[in-house]
């Protein structure tokens, strides 16, 4: 009798919980047919000269039915260029739909925080092709909600009366390069296009809020909406929220969520270990109300709109760096127009 047969027949009562009434087999597979679609990356027109400390805009063309990821590249007209500090090119990017501000993300958030907290795979992590501030990169990806996956794509075909626009605030070295913007579009078959164009959409989206550092030992958190997590852009080892020799705590409505704890490891290593997916070298303050920072599916929030007060308290060192909050909101698209369901 072969060893394989011996293992196969060595079954007891406990095995009923594992292999009794099997529901799957590892030796067959099934698949689902998907709706027909295509996709295309198309260059966008940047309106306004790219100059240091100035602003330009991109109004997305209605080339396709859905708008997906958007990114910027650099070149000197003879070859493409890579750079480590994209925050010297781009200060922040704002998203407008129908002339109303929907989200704003600065380069500190994109390059230092989102690179870790948004990563759903290695390719989008600090070990991927855009590693954030840790290494050089040939492109700068925007991290607005519609850029994070096909299920989040923005249905342009349902926005007959509202344009989608980004406004780019350039940083101090933008004039040194030729900057180009590209967007990925999805194209749908007639039936699915008609369905998306005519029905009402309540899109679950993420937004980014920012509080400037207080430069004192108490940081008031003036945020709104259900917040997934808090994070700071400080990636040094001697900041108030990152130092292994300073203690911090969170206070909500006058009640301490915890006693004072060392910033490192409690709010750096531990939070990244349990609540992120692809962080190998955590280096910034992170406080999670969610189970997973990278999941669009809600896994826990704290509704800051319902709080009287929220503070981060430092034991000895002043908090000098910005604090960011990533929150959920609903973008309603109906009758060819879009608007946020909940305002600040």
What are these regions (language model features)?
Residues 1-344:
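Short, low-complexity Pro/Thr/Gly
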């Amino acid at each position: 009798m072969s060893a394989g047969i011996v293992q196969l027949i060595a079954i007891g009562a406990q095995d009923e919980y594992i292999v009794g009434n099997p529901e799957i087999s590892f030796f067959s597979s099934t698949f689902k047919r998907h709706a027909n679609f295509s996709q295309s990356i198309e260059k966008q027109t940047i309106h306004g000269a790219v100059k240091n400390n100035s602003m330009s805009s991109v109004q997305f063309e209605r080339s396709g039915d859905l708008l997906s990821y958007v990114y910027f590249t650099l070149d000197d007209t003879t070859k493409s260029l890579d750079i480590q500090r994209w925050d010297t090119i781009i200060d922040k990017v704002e998203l407008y739909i129908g002339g109303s501000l929907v989200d704003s993300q600065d380069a500190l958030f994109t390059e230092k925080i989102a690179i870790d907290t948004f990563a759903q795979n290695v390719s989008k992590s600090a070990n991927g092709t855009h590693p954030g501030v840790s290494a050089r990169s040939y492109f700068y990806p925007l991290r607005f909600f519609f850029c994070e996956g096909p299920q989040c794509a923005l249905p342009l075909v349902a926005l007959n009366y509202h344009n989608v626009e980004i406004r780019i605030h350039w940083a101090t070295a933008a004039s040194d390069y030729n900057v180009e913007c590209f967007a990925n579009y999805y194209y749908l078959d007639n039936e699915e296009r008609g369905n998306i164009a005519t029905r009402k959409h309540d899109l679950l989206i993420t937004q980014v809020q920012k509080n400037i550092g207080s430069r004192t030992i108490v940081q008031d958190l003036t945020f709104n909406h259900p917040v997934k997590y808090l994070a700071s852009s400080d990636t040094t080892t001697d900041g108030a929220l990152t130092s292994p020799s300073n203690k911090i705590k969170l206070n909500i409505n006058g009640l301490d969520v915890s006693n004072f704890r060392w910033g490192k490891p409690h709010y750096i290593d531990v939070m990244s270990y349990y609540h992120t997916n692809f962080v190998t070298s955590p280096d910034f303050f992170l406080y999670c109300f969610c189970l997973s920072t990278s999941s669009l599916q809600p896994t826990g929030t704290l509704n800051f709109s319902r709080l009287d007060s929220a503070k981060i308290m430092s034991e000895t060192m002043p908090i000098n760096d910005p604090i960011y909050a990533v929150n959920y909101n609903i973008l309603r698209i109906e009758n060819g127009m879009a608007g946020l369901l909940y305002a600040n």
